[in-house]
Amino acid sequence: TKDQKKDYYTVLTLDQLDDLIINLKSSNLISLDLETTSTNPSIAEIVGLSFSISKNSAWYIPIMYPEKKDDIFGKKDIEVVINRLKNILEDSSLAKTGQNIKYDLHVLKRYGVNVQGIAFDTMIAAHLLNP
């Protein structure tokens, strides 16, 4: 409906990243999506990460973009962000879903993250419903 509250956030500080992590830890299902520089997961660099835990609520963590002049999180944004999110992404008790999540898993593996707890892939579901 028109009056439905929408909570969309851009994570630009370590405090905001820590708030996101608290929200992710308390959820039943985490939707994950990466924005990258390539469709080839072997060479893709992470441009940003998106997370959602409920309808009309999401977070985006920008890593690389044209207007970027300084690091947001420190010397190496991606390393700081990945190090903070790694425990959640590797926690098999936290269910995760995504669109073509296999791609995201391959990219994150190159960054040292072995994502666990995959529960659903919307791309596979779409293919099964409409082969």
Question: Where are the regions that the model predicts?
Answer:
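Electropositive, glycine- and tryptophan-enriched low-complexity nucleic-acid-binding patches
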Residues: 56-59
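Long, highly charged low-complexity segments
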Residues: 1-51, 63-88
